[in-house]
Amino acid sequence: MNRESDWLWVEPIMGSRRVSNFCWAAILLFGALGFFFVGISSYFGKDLIPFLSSQQILFVPQGVVMCFYGIAGLFLSFYLWCTIFWNVGSGYNKFDKKKKIVSLFRWGFPGENRRICINFFMKDIQGIRMEVQEGIYPRRTLYMKIKGQQDIPLTRIRENLTLGEIEEKAAELARFLRVSIEGL
């Protein structure tokens, strides 16, 4: 967490601009283009891309299916590239002791609700809750308990924090907000 002073705490949240998203978007784009061009090559009867042979593929039904998979892959790749470009999910958590307000801000998809901002008073915070699930896919999530509302997650679902890191993060935030820690 990034602590700026004794009364203000701002924690930046990483959105969809992650290395893994760039890799998946690129792999999906090149794979989809490969499928599409092999399908189109089977229609024309000659290879449009020299290293992708389509000589033994009939257009109906194999070429049509490959074109369909290529187009579907291009749509999925376009979606991933758009989320990366718009940086969906990025934002910050701001805890302001002077104004006694907590602001959670995230960027969404373009449109009417592009800016997602949730504000509430610090007096409504009941505590910090940790959820820890061990196993093949361990999940360690930090939540803020608010009076009369459901718990608000403060860490991303796929943020791989060790048990010590999540405990330290929870302790620092609970100390700053002067609330209790639950869970574990």
Swiss-Prot record:
The keyword Phosphoprotein does not apply. It is found in: Plastid, Chloroplast thylakoid membrane. Pfam families: Ycf4. It comes from the Eukaryota. InterPro entries: PSI_Ycf4_assembly (IPR003359). Keywords: Chloroplast, Membrane, Photosynthesis, Plastid, Thylakoid, Transmembrane, Transmembrane helix. One of its GO terms (biological process) is photosynthesis. It is a multi-pass membrane protein. Belongs to the Ycf4 family. This is Photosystem I assembly protein Ycf4. It comes from Physcomitrium patens (Spreading-leaved earth moss). The gene is ycf4.
